Amino acid sequence: MAARFLTLDEVAEELAVTKTQVYAMVRDGELPAIKIGKKGHWRVERAKLEEYIEAKYAE
């Protein structure tokens, strides 16, 4: 079973973009993400990533 949450590195790999580009999408509110832990590691829920991809196809 696939993990529910993805790191920004994993999202970047899925989208074939850089981690910096993914961080910019998160920072700008384009891609929903949550911060985990004291250090604030970003995580993207797999379902939200799938919704993001589907929305991009619909544009």
Task: State the predicted function of each range.
Residues 1-21:
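Polyanion-binding surface elements
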